[in-house]
């Protein structure tokens, strides 16, 4: 089959925006699906890749989908910049029936399968469309039938209709944040987007992952105020920086007691999510209320 734009299901209006519903044929029904969001540069790809490894070490069959045009979500797993779905399709003039799975799926560390959706050139096209077509291509090649866990690593904190598209496929959305004003402010906007999407889709907030932070006091205070919970805490350790330079996951680095505490935390997070994290019924703050709420007296 060729990949083509299908007629969208009826359009709904949600709080002043147009939302196109998910085609029921494109639902991911055979795996637990997590979408990882957070402020740009907060460490979503690091978190996603190490979480994927943790799931794989639980014996799960894992697929990680990078949803950033930079296509750098999975390089610590694959040790290279994987070809994107868009690159693969362009190579066959968008005749998807000519593609083989190995043209766009790369097996990474500990058997984690990796896909980089890629995206249109900067300032053109819709990244969300690319994500949707990636899922369709995976289904056409029956690659989701042998998968237990799908992890979407989503671009920055963009919550437009395009890059909110992984929420249409996800069971749980996870938010990566640091213990600072900018990260929590971005988290609140993501909570608002997920709150809106959950009215029409099955996605629910799974919780918050504290990253690159010595403490979690501001995160915990915000969580208590809006109805979120912290699932894990990963401090800002130099081994994280070194693992990225080495193009490796934390599970591949030279073991130390400090590093073991981090990998154990990832394993605990994977176990919690696999067991089924209860949804958080969070209600976002108004921007001005949050501005007054955060910080010290």
Swiss-Prot record:
InterPro entries from the UniProt entry: NifH/chlL_CS (IPR030655), NifH/frxC (IPR000392), P-loop_NTPase (IPR027417), Protochlorophyllide_ATP-bd (IPR005971)
A Pfam family recorded for this sequence: Fer4_NifH
Enzyme class name: oxidoreductase
Binding site for Mg(2+): 45
Keyword DNA-binding attached: no
Cofactor note: Binds 1 [4Fe-4S] cluster per dimer.
GO molecular function: 4 iron, 4 sulfur cluster binding; ATP binding; metal ion binding; oxidoreductase activity, acting on iron-sulfur proteins as donors; oxidoreductase activity, acting on the CH-CH group of donors, iron-sulfur protein as acceptor
Listed pathway(s): Porphyrin-containing compound metabolism; bacteriochlorophyll biosynthesis (light-independent)
Cofactor: [4Fe-4S] cluster
Enzyme Commission number(s): 1.3.7.7
Known catalytic reactions: chlorophyllide a + oxidized 2[4Fe-4S]-[ferredoxin] + 2 ADP + 2 phosphate = protochlorophyllide a + reduced 2[4Fe-4S]-[ferredoxin] + 2 ATP + 2 H2O
UniProt keyword annotation of Iron present: yes
Annotated ATP binding sites: 41-46, 70, 211-212, 235-237
Biological process annotations from GO: light-independent bacteriochlorophyll biosynthetic process; photosynthesis, dark reaction
Quaternary data: Homodimer. Protochlorophyllide reductase is composed of three subunits; BchL, BchN and BchB.
UniProt-listed PANTHER family: LIGHT-INDEPENDENT PROTOCHLOROPHYLLIDE REDUCTASE IRON-SULFUR ATP-BINDING PROTEIN
UniProt xrefs under HAMAP family: ChlL_BchL (MF_00355)
Record-linked NCBIfam families: DPOR_bchL
Protein family membership: Belongs to the NifH/BchL/ChlL family.
Name of the molecule in the record: Light-independent protochlorophyllide reductase iron-sulfur ATP-binding protein
Species of origin: Methylorubrum extorquens (strain PA1)
Gene encoding the protein: bchL
């Amino acid at each position: 089959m060729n990949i083509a734009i299908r007629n969208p299901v009826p359009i709904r209006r949600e709080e002043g925006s147009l939302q196109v519903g998910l085609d029921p044929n494109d639902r991911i029904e055979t795996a637990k699906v997590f979408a990882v969001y957070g402020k740009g540069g907060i460490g979503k790809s690091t978190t996603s890749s190490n979480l994927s490894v943790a799931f794989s070490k639980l014996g799960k069959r894992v697929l990680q989908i990078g949803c950033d045009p930079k296509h750098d979500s999975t390089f610590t797993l694959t040790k290279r910049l994987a070809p994107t779905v868009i690159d693969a399709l362009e190579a066959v003039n968008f005749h998807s029936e000519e593609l083989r799975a190995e043209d766009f799926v790369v097996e990474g560390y500990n058997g984690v399968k990796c896909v980089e959706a890629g995206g249109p050139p900067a300032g053109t096209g819709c990244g969300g469309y690319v994500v949707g077509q990636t899922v369709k291509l995976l289904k056409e090649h029956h690659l989701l039938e042998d998968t237990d866990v799908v992890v979407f690593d989503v671009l920055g904190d963009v919550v437009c209709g395009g890059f909110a598209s992984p929420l249409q496929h996800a069971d749980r959305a996870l938010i990566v944040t640091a213990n600072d004003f900018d990260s929590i402010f971005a988290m609140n906007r993501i909570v608002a987007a997920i709150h809106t999407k959950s009215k029409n889709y099955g996605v629910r907030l799974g919780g918050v992952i504290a990253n690159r932070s010595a403490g979690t006091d501001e995160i915990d205070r915000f969580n208590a105020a809006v109805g979120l919970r912290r699932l894990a805490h990963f401090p800002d350790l130099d081994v994280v920086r070194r693992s990225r330079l080495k193009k490796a996951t934390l599970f591949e680095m030279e073991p130390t007691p400090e590093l073991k505490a981090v990998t154990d935390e990832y394993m605990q997070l994977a176990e919690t999510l696999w067991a089924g994290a209860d949804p958080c019924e969070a209600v976002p703050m108004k921007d001005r209320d949050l501005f007054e709420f955060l910080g010290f007296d």
